[in-house]
């Protein structure tokens, strides 16, 4: 069986100077697995996610979704197979919570009653009472509530793959811990393949089934959380000492 996501020798160069922001990156992620990409700022984590989602086009290498080359699929269709959650959430400010969560199903021309059921189901899943929150606007929500809505929206059309880029990074420490705990529960219930970007090693070790450490655009470590903890690689030790 093909993994949900396979990244093969991915390279991305800046046009003009040939400098690689991502260089030779390879990994696979199966259903129910969460690959955490760790690394300092500028190490290539977010660029890698954008290459998977075709927000950027790789210079060379391949991205396969369920065995199908991503570049063989229309970009709009590809993004409907991939849920994307970012730190800034990106909710439409003049849409209600229900309209934000139901946006992709509506673009997919789902019947309105099916959209309404899906919105309620997802709000319950992420811990928001639909009767309380569905009619609210993003400015009426706390940071943690907005992030929950962002996760619900990413799940709306049931994509097999979720990409999460520092989703809890802008939250206060208490809310961040709450959402990390809730996210662990969602992992087991959803069975999605996930790629989770963070610079927080404690968060990565808590949430990941695999850890990938990037440095200057290259994966210098790929293994389980226990293997990461036991590694003698100097770059890994630096991260562990900062935990």
Residue ranges and their predicted role:
Residues 139, 157:
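Conserved signature/switch motifs of ABC ATPase nucleotide-binding domains
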Residues 216-217:
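Conserved ABC ATPase "signature" C-loop
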Residues 176-190:
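Helical segment within the ABC ATPase nucleotide-binding domain
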């Amino acid at each position: 069986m093909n993994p949900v996501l396979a990244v093969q020798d991915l390279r991305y160069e800046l046009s003009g100077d040939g400098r690689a922001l991502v260089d030779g990156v390879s990994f696979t992620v199966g259903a129910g697995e969460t690959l955490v990409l760790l690394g300092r700022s500028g190490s290539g984590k977010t660029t890698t996610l954008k290459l998977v989602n075709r927000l950027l086009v790789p210079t060379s290498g391949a991205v396969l979704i369920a065995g199908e080359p991503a570049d063989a699929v229309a970009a709009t269709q590809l993004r409907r197979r991939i849920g994307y959650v970012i730190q800034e959430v990106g909710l439409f400010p003049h849409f209600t919570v229900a309209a934000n969560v139901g946006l992709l199903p509506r673009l997919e021309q789902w019947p309105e009653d099916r959209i309404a059921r899906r919105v309620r189901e997802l709000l319950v899943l992420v811990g928001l009472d639909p009767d309380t929150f569905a009619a609210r606007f993003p400015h009426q929500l706390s940071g943690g509530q907005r992030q929950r809505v962002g996760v619900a929206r990413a799940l709306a059309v049931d994509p097999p793959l979720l990409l999460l880029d520092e989703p809890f990074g802008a939250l206060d420490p208490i809310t961040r811990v709450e959402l990390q705990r809730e996210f662990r529960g969602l992992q087991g219930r959803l069975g999605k393949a996930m790629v989770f970007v963070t610079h927080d090693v404690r968060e990565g070790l808590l949430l990941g089934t695999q850890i990938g450490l990037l440095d200057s655009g290259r994966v210098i470590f790929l293994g389980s959380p226990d293997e990461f903890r036991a590694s003698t690689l100097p770059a890994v030790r630096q991260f562990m000492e900062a935990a």
